[in-house]
């Protein structure tokens, strides 16, 4: 329900298919229902009952960590506000936010380096070298993921330039209701990455005006439908690797809950469009 909450929603926002205010107004309730219903059902099931004991933290915590966390989150939220006030492209606001975070990180890191050097807690070879947090963060950028999305978007753009995407969109509108197509698109995002699906849909319906209900429904479907399979979202893939969650365990324990949440949220959106908006 936020223009920066999912990469596909950000694509629609940057493509001027949806606006911030209308996106929040139309999707916050369906998104809330999509979250609450499966969470409530899961709370009644035995595997999800009990207390969770967090493992003890290892290593010394940085006292400036909370400051950087809150600063980063605040500046991310600032991006839609910046676009609304200045009417500049969203990437300008994001780069401005990044530069502020990098500047503050460098200032804090330089001060901590100076203090520890004075106190004599560093070795001689370490005193002559200051590790930049900005350079350290840049070295962790996942270039394969960036190139993956670049390849996907270029492929869709090539198909769009040939007119194939537009032709397919016309055939879809003549064959099935567009709302049903959007629901199937959300389900398909659990198998196929949602980025190419949304990029293709933006080329299928070029005549739809900004803030048309279809664009908002696509934002909801693509953003939540991928959770039905663990491989359908970037967060699921990361969790599968970090927590060793198997594909079939997720499908058996979580997949049906995600399906219920997805369908109830979609139903809430369609009912709201029918009777309230």
Protein language model features and the residues they cover:
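Juxtamembrane and boundary regions of transmembrane helices in multi-pass small-molecule transporters
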Residues: 1-2, 11-13, 18-68, 72, ...
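Hydrophobic core segments of alpha-helical transmembrane domains in multi-pass membrane transport
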Residues: 31-43, 69-81, 97-106, 149-157, ...
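Transmembrane helical segments that form the transport core of multi-pass membrane transport proteins
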Residues: 75, 79, 83-213
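Loop-to-transmembrane-helix entry motif
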Residues: 141, 221, 254-258
């Amino acid at each position: 329900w936020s223009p920066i909450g999912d990469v596909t929603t950000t694509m629609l926002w940057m493509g001027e298919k949806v606006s911030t205010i209308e996106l929040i107004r139309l999707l916050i309730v369906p998104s809330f229902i999509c979250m609450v219903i499966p969470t409530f059902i899961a709370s009644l099931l035995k595997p999800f009952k009990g207390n969770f004991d967090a493992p003890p933290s290892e290593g010394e915590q940085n006292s400036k960590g909370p400051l950087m966390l809150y600063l980063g989150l605040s500046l991310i939220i600032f991006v839609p506000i910046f676009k609304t006030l200045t009417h500049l492209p969203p990437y300008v606001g994001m780069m401005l936010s990044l530069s502020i975070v990098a500047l503050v990180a460098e200032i804090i890191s330089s001060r901590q380096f100076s203090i520890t050097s004075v106190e004599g807690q560093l070795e001689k070879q370490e005193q002559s070298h200051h590790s930049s947090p900005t350079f350290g963060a840049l070295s962790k950028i996942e270039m394969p993921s960036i190139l993956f999305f670049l390849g996907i978007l270029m492929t869709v753009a090539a198909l769009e330039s040939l007119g194939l995407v537009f032709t397919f969109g016309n055939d879809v509108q003549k064959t099935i209701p567009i709302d049903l197509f959007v629901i199937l698109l959300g389900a398909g995002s659990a198998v196929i990455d949602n980025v190419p699906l949304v990029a293709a849909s933006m080329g299928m319906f070029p005549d739809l005006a900004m803030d048309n209900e279809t664009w908002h429904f696509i934002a909801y479907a693509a953003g939540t439908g991928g959770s039905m399979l663990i491989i359908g979202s970037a967060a699921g893939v990361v969790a599968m690797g970090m927590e060793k969650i198997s594909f079939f365990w997720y499908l058996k324990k979580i997949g049906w809950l995600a399906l219920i949440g997805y369908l109830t949220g979609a139903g809430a959106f369609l009912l709201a469009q029918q009777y309230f908006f």
